[in-house]
Amino acid sequence: MSTKIVAIGDQFIGAQHYQSALNGAPISFDSVDLPGTKEDQHTAQQVMEVKGPNSVDPDNKVLEKIKSANIITAHFAPMGKKLIDVAPDLKLIAVARAGLENVDVQTATSRGIGVVPAFGRNANAVAELQIGLMLAEARNIARADASIKEGGWRKDFPGARIEIGNSTVGMVGFGQIGRAHV
């Protein structure tokens, strides 16, 4: 019996991307994309971030597809108790992001189902943003932009002569994002 993977695509990572990544693997593969728009997905994400993964019902097409799944891979799809209970052979939930707000980890763990997030998936992007924000703060970019938009042309911002090259700057921690700076 081959391992059956079901990919649940969404408005940001479609199921075809999972299929492409798993092409050639000795598995049985099926997929389904969540219906709706990016706005619908964003609303569902916000609800799950506040109320948890059981606050948004899974799509009926998803429930039908995962009944015989051994592995589910998804990004933001709601994977609460209702979804987990439909798949008696489920062994692993792989999430294509670091956050697990959309997964009922307690239910999965109680059933012996592994839950694997993609820690550090966006670490480089966040590290680059962090460098940009440090530069923006040191050089007063946001305040200068706001002043210009209001018709001003300030020439005297506090710290205007600060240059990163002559400063000690950094971040606290050496997790995924901290290591991206090294």
Predicted regions span which residues?
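N-terminal glycine-/charge-rich "phosphate-binding" loop or analogous flexible N-terminal tail
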Residues: M1-I71
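Cofactor-binding loop segments of dinucleotide-utilizing enzymes, especially the Rossmann-like FAD-
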Residues: I8-D10, A98, F174
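Phosphate-coordination loops involved in phosphoryl transfer and adenosine-cofactor binding
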Residues: S2, L90, G165-T168
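Short hydrophobic/charged patches on amphipathic alpha-helices used for structural packing
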Residues: N60-L63, K81, R161
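Rossmann-like dinucleotide/phosphate-binding beta-alpha-beta segment
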Residues: P158-H181
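Phosphate/diphosphate ligand-binding glycine-rich loop within oxidoreductases
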Residues: K67-D145
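Short gly/ser/thr-rich secondary-structure transition/capping motifs
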Residues: G52-D57, A74-H75, K149-D156
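Alpha-helix capping/helix-boundary segments
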Residues: I13, P78-G80, I177
